[in-house]
Amino acid sequence: MSLATNKSILISGYGSIGRKHANILSKIFKKKNITILTKQKIKSFTTIHKLKELIKIKPNYIVISNPTGDHINKLKFIEKNYRNKIILVEKPLFSKPNKFKVKKNKCYVG
């Protein structure tokens, strides 16, 4: 039984870590509330294939599990288009030193 029925999740990236997040979160949230941003075709979750498609959904929580070099692009897009979202970014945060700061959303690195 899903506990958080009205919350929506975006998982950016569906490699091994993205899959783990999707499997764990699908035990808490309804699968229909989980969207995966990936180029892969996935039958068990809703997918979007381009970052700009993210505008169509309004996620409460965002997990960034893409390759490290792509984290900055995702964070900048989210920061530009959303407020008050909770973001989990897989470590390391960036592949090279960066002074970008998330100000409109809450960002955690793990």
Outline where the language-model segments fall.
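A contiguous active-site-proximal alpha/beta segment in oxidoreductase catalytic domains
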Residues: 93-110
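N-terminal glycine-rich "phosphate-gripper" loop used for MgATP/nucleotide binding
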Residues: 59, 64-71, 92-94
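N-terminal Rossmann-like dinucleotide-binding module
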Residues: 1-45, 57
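Structural motif
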Residues: 8, 60-61, 86
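A short helix->loop->beta-strand "cap" motif at the edges of active sites that frequently abuts
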Residues: 30-32, 82-86, 105-106
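Rossmann-fold NAD(P) dinucleotide-binding segment
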Residues: 69-90
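Short amphipathic alpha-helix with an adjacent loop that forms part of the alpha/beta core around
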Residues: 48-58, 101
